[in-house]
Amino acid sequence: MKEKHNPRRKYCLISGLAIIFSLWIIIGNGAKVQAETITVSTPIKQIFPDDAFAETIKDNLKKKSVTDAVTQNELNSIDQIIANNSDIKSVQGIQYLPNVTKLFLNGNKLTDIKPLTNLKNLGWLFLDENKIKDLSSLKDLKKLKSLSLEHNGISDINGLVHLPQLESLYLGNNKITDITVLSRLTKLDTLSLEDNQISDIVPLAGLTKLQNLYLSKNHISDLRALAGLKNLDVLELFSQECLNKPINHQSNLVVPNTVKNTDGSLVTPEIISDDGDYEKPNVKWHLPEFTNEVSFIFYQPVTIGKAKARFHGRVTQPLKEVYTVSYDVDGTVIKTKVEAGTRITAPKPPTKQGYVFKGWYTEKNGGHEWNFNTDYMSGNDFTLYAVFKAETTEKTVNLTRYVKYIRGNAGIYKLPREDNSLKQGTLASHRCKALTVDREARNGGKLWYRLKNIGWTKAENLSLDRYDKMEYDKGVTAYARVRNASGNSVWTKPYNTAGAKHVNKLSVYQGKNMRILREAKTPITTWYQFSIGGKVIGWVDTRALNTFYKQSMEKPTRLTRYVSANKAGESYYKVPVADNPVKRGTLAKYKNQKLIVDCQATIEGQLWYRIRTSSTFIGWTKAANLRAQK
């Protein structure tokens, strides 16, 4: 029997078959029905305590009232019950109806179907739109051929393992994830599982008698298990919602494509969110700013047997917002990534000779002491500082420290006290030198170091490291030109960080477009790494530049444009700057095509449009290259 999965058609078909099989009350091979019986004439409402169900039985037996008495012979005459949308909450008493072959109780309020256990002749059972969760009571219904349990909120279908004789099964609009048990139901010709939470369909591979299969609105991304179902006449696979496991946000994100056709080949994404690209087998995104998810839409026509289907849906990749916690122990910094809104794992308490570790604090000198049991990661990078308590006010030590570059003007004193009358000079001349600390003291809660043969200075002016640490280093997209070359240079790394070497004077690059690649912050300032003509040059102080393009200048819009006839040779770019390294091509290939403008930016007085077709991202071009009419 072939069926189209249409609820109205399904129930019309069932009603017709109910009439055809209305005389199906004989038990095969003369077997005796093990059902409960009444021995004396009994009022209907005493047998069937649910008022609504009692009314159904009254009407079925053509009685005037539920107080009318009935005999077991009269109950034996009932072979089908149709009581859809009747507000029935219990079918208690149905065990006295041994010859029921068809039972239609859709749209009621049933939760317990244990009374059905002994209905050995039951062949058709439809219980859509109830509140049934436990299917174990169906295990002895060996004549059951057609079962419908749609819209019940079912998550566990393991109770169906005892029903291998089923030929049609409707389980749509539930909460099913695991269909392993269905591999046992090899006689099925119709199976509906639409609108569930199914991702693994391997258990269906052996159901070769299937003619009608409904799998729309699930989480399916791999069709290989369906390749052998050659008897299919109807197959539905649309609107799949596939959710990957969350991963950390990255500025350059790579996600493998796992959507597969029946032959195992990858299904190419049709539309990729957030300007992503597809480079088989990976989907790639450039995400300089955090977004909580990315996705792509897929579409693939599929033919299996006689069935033609549209396999399409969306794959969503959730992203975790992670930030950096820096643990600073007297200038030595260890960094770790932590998801926003979660608790931070406490690191091993640091040790320091002559000091007792007090705790981790949000500021070097005080602030909030971090409670690793109750405090949660905020939505930004931050530093926790190890705070120690001196065991004595002054003692002998033997340490090596360096002057922090930005502390060069800090004072040196005869005693561990900030008093101009005791001042001997500044730390400027001692930069970049390894300095020996031979004494330490605390005064007013401040830690002081005595530099051997030099004098006293605050410990906060010194560092364990010769070089500055970068507070962050991230990819950015921007363009700039030199604003102030005087006294500024270009470095292989941000100045005064480990490995930084002089490249050139900044004046050499005056007037040139500088493509900004990365941004880093050190205690001195914020730095940009830049390239010119596609060649990476180095790092420069951002204060020396004038940034004429950054992504925040882009504004969303919605326009339709066409390439101007005389502008087909003009170029389009990855960003709204006419720079050859980001050039993508010319507008000639899009001549006479309808283009969508989804973003605009005004760069140095010049209006730019970001264009795309209905499904493909193109790039940025000057608005002057386009016109409103075809």
Curated annotation (Swiss-Prot):
InterPro entries: Cu-Rt/internalin_Ig-like (IPR014755), GW_dom (IPR025987), GW_dom_sf (IPR038200), Ig_E-set (IPR014756), Inl_IR (IPR012569), InlB-like_B-rpt (IPR013378), Internalin_N (IPR024634), Leu-rich_rpt (IPR001611)
MF-aspect GO terms: heparin binding; lipid binding; metal ion binding
GO biological process, one term: entry of bacterium into host cell
Start-end of each LRR repeat: 75-97, 98-121, 123-141, 142-163, 164-187, 189-207, 208-231
Entry cofactors: Ca(2+)
GO annotation, cellular component aspect: cell surface; extracellular region; peptidoglycan-based cell wall; plasma membrane
Signal peptide: 1-30
Positions annotated to bind Ca(2+) 2: E55, D59
Stretch list, region B repeat region: 320-392
Domain LRRCT: 241-330
SUPFAM superfamilies the UniProt entry points to: E set domains, L domain-like, Prokaryotic SH3-related domain
Recorded domain comment: Has an N-terminal region with 8 leucine-rich repeats (LRR) and has 3 GW repeats in the C-terminus. Residues 241-319 form an Ig-like region, followed by a 72 residue-long flexible B repeat region. The GW repeats mediate non-covalent binding of the protein to lipoteichoic acid (LTA) on the bacterial membrane. The GW domain mediates binding to host complement component 1 Q subcomponent-binding protein (gC1q-R, C1QBP) and to heparin; heparin binding dissociates InlB from the bacterial surface. The LRR domain forms a curved tube, the N-terminus of which has a cap that binds 2 Ca(2+) ions.
Biological role: Mediates the entry of L.monocytogenes into normally non-phagocytic mammalian host cells. Its host receptor is hepatocyte growth factor receptor (HGF receptor, a tyrosine kinase, MET) which is tyrosine-phosphorylated in response to InlB in human, green monkey, mouse and dog cell lines. Downstream adapter proteins GAB1 and CBL are phosphorylated in response to InlB, which also causes cell colony scattering. InlB binding to mammalian cells is saturable and inhibited by EDTA; InlB-coated beads can be taken up by host cells.
Name of this protein: Internalin B
